[in-house]
Amino acid sequence: MALDIHAHRILILDFGSQYTQLIARRVREIGVYCELHPFDMDDEAIREFNPRGIILAGGPESVHEANSPRAPQAVFDLNVPVLGICYGMQTMAEQMGGKVEGSDLREFGYARVDVVGKSRLLDGIEDHVDDDGVLGLDVWMSHGDKVTQMPGNFNILASTPSCPIAGMYDDVRGYYGVQFHPEVTHTKQGGRILSRFVQDICGCEALWTASNIVEDAIAQVRAQVGSANVLLGLSGGVDSSVVAALLHRAIGDQLTCVFVDNGLLRLHEGDQVMAMFKENMGVKVIRADAEKQFLDNLEGEADPEKKRKIIGRTFIDVFDAEASKLENIQFLAQGTIYPDVIESAGAKSGKAHVIKSHHNVGGLPEEMNLKLVEPLRELFKDEVRKIGLELGLPYDMVYRHPFPGPGLGVRILGEVKKEYADILRRADHIFIEELRKADWYHKTSQAFVVFQPVKSVGVVGDGRRYAWVVALRAVETVDFMTARWAHLPYELLETVSGRIINEIDGISRVTYDVSSKPPATIEWE
């Protein structure tokens, strides 16, 4: 009998915290499957999900305000362990008969909590022990309200001078609340605390591993597809590359990939994609050389959003034309990942604060009457990378920096021309090559060159040169929501600048972008 890697599962209810997806990623890192659902998930759906434990996440609301979110009653009727984090602790306390009040003393950022009670959750977990034998934890706080009265049968778990009930517990029922955030790295023992809850208290085994996920995904694909043929748009990005490798292992020649070369890729990228998948792995890949079509459609357009739409529409036209030449295709594969699923669900329910618009292949599934195959839809990005390595993809491919869907089209400011793209490709290649040589590539989260359609005077030998300006951009970030410009060594910047100006005819000046996000975005367009 096949192993059910979803059997031991945790339910996470989202009350709107910026950290909620981080909780899910931390639980997955422990090796346990979990799903993220809105706080108002109906009772029947919760019972059907049949979790071994439930985590109530944080949120921006105040429990004592009218119409603030509450946990469904099923959470407390299932007789499974519950962990409330920040707002989750507050609503648990209030719903079970305790009291929550606002406070003039808000806690945001680093704090030290004293471990007061003897609970299963924190037993043996500490960062400090003071002279009186009191255990302490270094944690991350982000709250204004606080629990001032616990429900019956609860004991104090942790406290700070301004928040006497910074944690509470009922070991008999397995109910726990912490005012701090164990999911963020600033809470040093956060991983151990979550592992204690998920594995020891909820009894979940670590079944959610890369090798198990691959085996399960292959079985699911084979069961869904059978002997039918599958079409995949291969971009060379991480998600589509992992989908291609996974589907090829699952169904072999039933998979056909279409690689659209739009003329806006990095240097030699098209050849590298073909070499990796067609020549080395034996995947059926059709290469559509559509550079002229993309550049013709972009001619004269300088507006960034309009450029994106033109590139998106042209991709669909080219992909559609290639797909229509194929016979007996019943399925379309896409690299949808779990954050996309969460955002789509949020959009439908109206609860999501920020919605990204994704264009994969537009309305193609409906037009061609194709059914969707989405083998990565349960996975976060970091899990997709681990799966890629498990499938044998090279580390440098799996951990390459993000590249925008419109490619160099949004790294060329203003109108896109072939001359600009060719210059930018070479400059970008030099920058990345030198970052790798200096062991800085994986220290940065994203690095690239931007082409600026302005000319500057330079001197070459005894002559004057009037040529283009490019900007180097390198950032460090954890989540791409905020980012800091990378403090690259001056010697490295000097080497990159020297090579670009000397080796590329057409560039006279190199600048370095020292803007952080916010206020700037990572990409220039």
Curated annotation (Swiss-Prot):
Query: Looking at the UniProt record for this protein, which Gene Ontology cellular component terms does it annotate, in alphabetical order?
Result: cytosol
Catalytic reaction equation(s): XMP + L-glutamine + ATP + H2O = GMP + L-glutamate + AMP + diphosphate + 2 H(+)
Which Pfam family name is an example for this entry? Answer: GATase
Q: PANTHER family of this UniProt entry?
A: GMP SYNTHASE [GLUTAMINE-HYDROLYZING], GMP SYNTHASE-RELATED
Q: Cite the entry's keywords alphabetically.
A: ATP-binding, Glutamine amidotransferase, GMP biosynthesis, Ligase, Nucleotide-binding, Purine biosynthesis
InterPro entries documented for this protein = Class_I_gatase-like (IPR029062), GATASE (IPR017926), GMP_synth_C (IPR001674), GMP_synth_GATase (IPR004739), GMP_synthase (IPR022955), GMPS_ATP_PPase_dom (IPR025777), NAD/GMP_synthase (IPR022310), Rossmann-like_a/b/a_fold (IPR014729)
Q: Which domain of life is it from?
A: Bacteria
Q: Could you confirm whether the keyword Iron appears in this record?
A: no
- Chain coiled-coil ranges: none
Subunit annotation: Homodimer.
- UniProt xrefs under Gene3D superfamilies: 3.30.300.10, 3.40.50.880, HUPs (3.40.50.620)
Domain Glutamine amidotransferase type-1 span(s) in chain numbering = 9-207
Residues engaged in binding ATP = 235-241
Pathway the protein takes part in: Purine metabolism; GMP biosynthesis; GMP from XMP (L-Gln route): step 1/1
Cited SUPFAM superfamilies: Adenine nucleotide alpha hydrolases-like, Class I glutamine amidotransferase-like, GMP synthetase C-terminal dimerisation domain
Q: Which GO terms describe its molecular function?
A: ATP binding; GMP synthase activity
Enumerate the active-site residues: 86 (nucleophile), 181, 183
This protein is called GMP synthase [glutamine-hydrolyzing]
> Has keyword Oxidoreductase?
no
Question: Under which EC number(s) is this enzyme classified?
Answer: 6.3.5.2
Q: What class of enzyme is it?
A: ligase
Name the job this protein performs: Catalyzes the synthesis of GMP from XMP.
